[in-house]
Amino acid sequence: KVLLAKTLQANCPTLVQNDRKINLVNAYHPVLFLTNKQQGQKTIPFQCQFDSRNRIMVISGPNAGGKSITLKTIGLLQIMLQCGLFITAHPKSEMSIIQNIFGDIGDNQSIEDGLSTYSSRLLKMKYFLQHADSNSLFLIDEFGTGSDPDMGGALAEVILNKLNEKQSIGVVTTHFTNLKLLANHQEGIFNACMLFNSKSLKPLYQLQLGEPGSSFTFEVANKTGLDKELIQAAKGKLSKEKVKMDKLLNQLQLEKNNLEKLKR
C-alpha cells in the first residue's frame, strides 16, 4: 500500500464520520496519471464537493471532454478509500464511508439474456431505485441514452428526481437539455461542465462547477467540413429555445476563455 501510494502520489484524506461528505481537492484518475507520466504529459486535476445540500452533480459538455473520466475518478477514489488505500487527491480532501455504491457505466448489452443496451440500463435503474438510500453513491454515465431522446430524457429526469428524493449522492453525465435545466432549479441537484475552447474546439479537461455546458455539436460539425447547408437544415429542425440556449452556453464559454486569458 505504501509503494502504491508513492507511485500514484496518493494521500490520506480527512475521514468525516458524522456526515456524508465527498470533498475532493485536486483529484485525478490514478491510471490516467500513470499513463500521462509515461508519455511525459501533465494530468489536470479537478475539485468537487458533495454534501447534504448539494448531492447530485450533473456533468455536461462535449464528447471526449473528460465527463466520463471525472465520473469514474470520483467512484474509484471512494472505493480506494473504503479498501484502505490512499487516494489520488490533495490531503485536504474530505471523505466519508458510504454503504452502497451503484454504477452504470458503458454498454450493458447482453446477447445471452436478449437484452438491448437500453433495456439493460433500465434494469439497473430499477435496482438503483429499489436499493438506494441516503447512504448511497450512484454513478450513471450518459444517463438516458439508448432510446428516443425525448422519451429517454423524460424518463431519466423522473428517475433522477426519485434518487434525489432518496437523498442519495450521485454523479451523472449527460447531453440532455432537460437534465441541465432540472439541475439548475431543483434543490439537491447541481450542474457542472467540462470546459472547452470554443475557438479551437478542443477540450480543456477542466471541471467547472455550477453551470451546464454545451455539446458544441454544430461547431464541431462545421470544423470537420460538413456542408454548411446541412448544418443549417439541422438547426432548423430544433426548437428556437434549444438553439438559443446552446448559443448562450457557447457564448458563456467564450467569455470564460477570454477572462482566463486576461487573468494570465
Q: Which residues fall in each region the model found?
A:
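Extended, charged alpha-helical coiled-coil/arm scaffolds that mediate oligomerization and mechanical coupling
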Residues: K1-L4
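ATPase nucleotide-binding head domains, primarily ABC-like/P-loop NTPase cores
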Residues: K6-L262
